[in-house]
Regions:
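Alpha-helix C-terminal capping segments
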Residues: 84-90, 117-128
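Hydrophobic/aromatic beta-strand patches that form the interior of the parallel beta-sheet core
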Residues: 32-34, 71, 97, 128-132, ...
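Glycine-rich phosphate/pyrophosphate-binding loops
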Residues: 123-146
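Glycine/threonine-rich flexible loop motifs
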Residues: 104-113
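Active-site glycine-rich loop that binds ribose-phosphate moieties when present
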Residues: 113-119, 142-165
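A cross-family phosphate/adenosyl-ligand binding-site feature
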Residues: 2-5, 19-87, 91-92
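C-terminal accessory domains and tails appended to enzymatic cores
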Residues: 149, 166-168, 172-260
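Short acidic, Gly/Ser-rich segments with clustered Asp/Glu that frequently serve as metal-coordination loops
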Residues: 11-19, 211
Length: 260
């Protein structure tokens, strides 16, 4: 029996990035494709509560020119994973693959990331996870019209590392392998093991004076101090060295110092 891979994302079940990821690994495993019905970027590992949350709709995703069955879940990426594991899957997935995300997931933004939120939810069910994200301009990161991207470098990374994890498992104390692929990467771009930066690649800008009784969405802008990102970090790797960043992430958030 082939292994079962749960594919998900935070950009929505019809995202070309999700289809590209499925195409990259479809020969290695049976695929269960379950993702939010709509764009859910920056939802983290949240579980919103509303009357429509948890509704599930089957749909077709075009993968390599062929239709594959997928499921859209009304809710966050983490909710999609939970419903996939608890209701849709007929057996426990061997691996969760989250992406390919429009926009890098690095530094302090990791806790905001729906891509990583889905991966952490999978690991909470005992499923190892890989997250794959492509560096794109900020204005594309929340887009629901899915601008065209070159996914090939991301697909190569996914295919190689999925095979490796299925064969060998994750390294000790690792919950997720977090891959970030820089703009312009190709088959010659090396992979570098990095650590999570203490900076962010973007920040919220201060709003102009406005009536507080009206709804408002904070806007992001590039971090003007990005060049202060630490050497050896995920941000430094993709923004300045232009290499593929691989950050092994753990589940335990406890600090090493200051604990009894």
């Amino acid at each position: 029996m082939k292994p079962l891979i749960l594919l998900t994302n935070d950009d929505g079940v019809l995202s070309p990035g999700l289809a590209a990821l499925a195409e990259a690994v479809q020969d290695q495993a049976e695929l269960l494709i379950v993702a939010p019905r709509w764009q859910q970027t920056t939802m983290g590992r949240s579980f919103p509560r509303n009357d429509s949350a948890g509704t599930i709709e089957a749909c077709d995703l075009l993968v390599g020119g062929m239709k594959k069955k997928a499921f859209g879940v009304t809710g966050s990426p983490a909710q999609a994973v939970a419903h996939a594991v608890l209701e849709i899957a007929d057996r426990m997935p061997d691996l969760c693959l989250s992406g390919i995300n429009y926009g890098e997931n690095v530094g302090l933004s990791l806790t905001c990331s729906g891509t990583l939120g889905a991966a952490f939810e999978a690991f909470s069910h005992g499923i190892p996870a890989i997250a794959v994200s492509l560096q794109v301009p900020l204005h594309h990161q929340h887009a629901a019209d899915y601008p065209a991207m070159d996914w090939r470098a991301c697909q190569r990374v996914a295919a190689v590392w999925v095979a490796r994890v299925l064969a060998e498992g994750l390294p000790p104390d690792t919950a997720i392998l977090n891959f970030n692929i820089p703009t312009g990467a190709d088959h010659t771009t090396p992979v570098r093991i990095t650590r999570q930066s203490r900076r962010s690649s973007s920040r919220f800008s201060r709003p102009e004076p406005r009536p507080w009784q009206l709804g408002f969405q904070l806007h992001s802008e590039p971090d003007p101090l990005l060049d202060q990102a630490e050497s050896g970090s995920d941000i430094h790797a993709i923004h300045f060295e232009k290499v593929i960043s691989l950050t092994p992430l753990g589940w335990d958030l406890t600090t090493k110092e200051g604990t009894p």
